[in-house]
């Protein structure tokens, strides 16, 4: 047995050992925390969270460096990133996902740091040129981010209904053809299994956030743009003639009660839901829709949906007067510009790891967005579901890489939503056109103010010109099967369609000529009477 002295000594050593464990344990925990990296990513759809967890665990196995993963919603991301870097830089992320159009803004704000020293290690030659354009601020050489995945939009159709109506791929080759197809579908009496009338198409006209992306193909395909270089900066191009033609077509479809009857009451998510329920024949959306068909309903997927049964067909982009274009966005990865630079080297290691070809491929396959790495794209091209989406990259454009684009984008989003509100309350075509011209003129002025561009345009003349373009008819080419669906007596002839553009002018000339002829006859009759 231990005597009292021995017990006291033993007890003292035990306490000392326990304290030592606490102290060294605290140091160990602190050391571990100091090595932990932080990465912020958005919720990129079904499968994205699990895919990121796997990538982070794999990185830890390879390097021994722990990573704290934070997932943000797209709705909160911009604001949270802005405030975190401005107010509490210490807890800002080491690596961060940014929407492609956000990179110039956060680079100019000093929230992310240049990564030029990593270019050769990452090998940015692997990435698409259009994606690389938004990795820096326009006119400046520094690179601030690297493309991660691509968000390219395309036109999808319900394959079963498309075939049932007897349509062909050539019936979608131009926007004139698209109008003919939309009007043909509108004249059909198709209904879903639930008895809901099938409608042709929908654009987001209420409480939406993607208006600029949806307007883009209409504007670009007709030679227009939202902003263009001017001197040392940029100016709004909303009142340029080609832009107005594209906006007029967009507005024509959005405000048409037959071609897109639900546009004025839905956002882009609701547009997609209608397509998924097979209540719409055509949808303009992203490639992630294809991937969602693989996930069961329990996981939030679309494997049991109506569109999964009917099938999705990806169409070639329709052409306008200046070619065919679609919007290409996506997400980039960047490095946080932090006051504490002690983990910069580790953060660079994580960035390079995330951008490895195998990791880009693994993540992209889970979320359904195209990989930004060209060396992987050729593999995706073998999949018939994605081959046309990959082919669209040749005709895809991104928005300008200027710091002000975020503010410009808000004006364009408001413009699209305001169009929807206008069309709900105003049915008269001339009143619609006048109000729309005023709306575009005001948006043009706001954008020029954001870009610090002095506008010397004559407002009344420009609004009058815009209204004139908004009143013009757009050519329509009907599919061959339209005669059976609409009825031959109701189907416009090709010559009638061509003449429709100048019908009002022709009517005035005809009336004038008739009046002149009547005057001549009356004059001759009076002269004969005098004789």
Regions found by a protein language model. Give the residues of each.
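Extracytoplasmic "Venus flytrap"/periplasmic binding protein-like
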Residues: 58-130, 160, 164-166, 273-274, ...
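Extracytoplasmic/periplasmic solute-binding protein
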Residues: 140-148, 153, 177-235
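Short, solvent-exposed loop/beta-turn-alpha elements that line the ligand-binding surface or hinge
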Residues: 116-128, 199-205, 224-245, 298-307, ...
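Conserved C-terminal helix/tail region of periplasmic/extracytoplasmic solute-binding proteins
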Residues: 394-527
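Long, aromatic- and glycine/proline-rich binding clefts that accommodate carbohydrate-like moieties
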Residues: 136, 309-317, 364-421, 478-479
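Hinge/lid segment of periplasmic solute-binding proteins
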Residues: 99-154, 194-195, 211-214, 307-318
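Extracytoplasmic/periplasmic substrate-recognition and gating elements
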Residues: 136, 142, 164-165, 255-261, ...
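Glycine-centered hinge/linker elements that transmit conformational signals in sensory
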Residues: 181-183, 229-265, 317
């Amino acid at each position: 047995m231990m005597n009292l002295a021995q017990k006291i000594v033993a007890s003292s050593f035990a306490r000392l050992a326990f304290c030592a464990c606490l102290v060294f344990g605290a140091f160990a925990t602190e050391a571990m925390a100091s090595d932990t990296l932080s990465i912020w990513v958005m919720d990129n759809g079904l499968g994205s969270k699990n895919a990121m967890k796997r990538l982070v665990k794999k990185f830890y196995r390879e390097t021994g460096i722990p990573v704290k993963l934070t997932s943000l919603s797209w709705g909160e991301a911009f604001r949270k990133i802005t405030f975190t870097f401005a107010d509490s830089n210490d807890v800002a992320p080491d690596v961060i996902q940014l929407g492609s159009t956000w990179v110039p803004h956060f680079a100019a704000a000093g929230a992310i740091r240049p990564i030029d020293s990593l270019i050769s290690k990452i090998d940015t030659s692997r990435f698409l040129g259009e994606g690389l354009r938004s990795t820096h601020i326009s006119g400046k050489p520094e690179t601030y981010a690297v493309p991660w995945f691509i968000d390219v939009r395309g036109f999808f159709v319900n394959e079963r209904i498309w075939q049932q109506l007897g349509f062909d791929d050539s019936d979608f080759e131009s926007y004139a053809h698209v109008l003919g197809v939309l009007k043909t579908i509108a004249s059909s009496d198709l209904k879903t299994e639930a008895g809901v009338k099938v409608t042709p198409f929908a654009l987001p006209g209420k409480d939406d956030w993607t208006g600029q992306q949806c307007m883009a193909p209409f504007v670009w395909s007709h030679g227009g743009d939202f902003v263009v270089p001017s001197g040392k900066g940029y100016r709004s191009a909303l009142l340029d003639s080609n832009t107005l033609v594209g906006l007029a077509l967009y507005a024509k479809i959005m405000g048409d009660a037959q071609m897109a009857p639900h546009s004025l009451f839905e956002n882009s998510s609701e547009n997609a839901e209608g397509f998924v329920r097979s209540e719409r024949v055509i949808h303009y959306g992203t490639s992630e829709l294809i991937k969602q068909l693989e996930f069961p309903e329990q996981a939030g997927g679309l494997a049991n949906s109506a569109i999964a049964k009917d099938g999705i067909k990806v169409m070639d982009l329709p052409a306008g007067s200046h070619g065919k274009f679609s919007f290409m966005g996506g997400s980039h990865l960047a490095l946080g510009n932090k006051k504490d630079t002690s983990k910069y080297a580790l953060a660079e290691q994580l960035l390079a790891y995330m951008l490895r070809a195998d990791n880009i491929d693994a993540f992209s396959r889970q979320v359904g967005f195209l990989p930004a790495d060209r060396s992987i794209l050729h593999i995706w091209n073998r999949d018939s579901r994605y081959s046309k989406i990959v082919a669209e990259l040749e005709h895809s454009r991104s928005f300008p890489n200027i710091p002000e684009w975020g503010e410009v984008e808000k004006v364009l989003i408001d413009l699209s939503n305001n169009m929807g509100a206008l069309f709900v309350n105003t049915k008269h075509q001339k009143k619609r056109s006048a109000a729309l011209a005023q709306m575009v003129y005001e948006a043009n002025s706001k954008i020029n103010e954001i870009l610090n561009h002095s506008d010397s345009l004559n407002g009344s003349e420009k609004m009058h010109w815009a209204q004139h373009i908004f009143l013009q008819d757009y050519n329509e080419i009907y599919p061959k099967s339209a005669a059976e669906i609409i009825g031959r007596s109701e189907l416009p002839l090709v010559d009638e369609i061509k003449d429709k553009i100048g019908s009002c002018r022709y009517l005035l000339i005809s009336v004038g000529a008739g009046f002149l002829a009547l005057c001549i006859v009356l004059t001759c009759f009076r002269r004969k009477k005098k004789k």
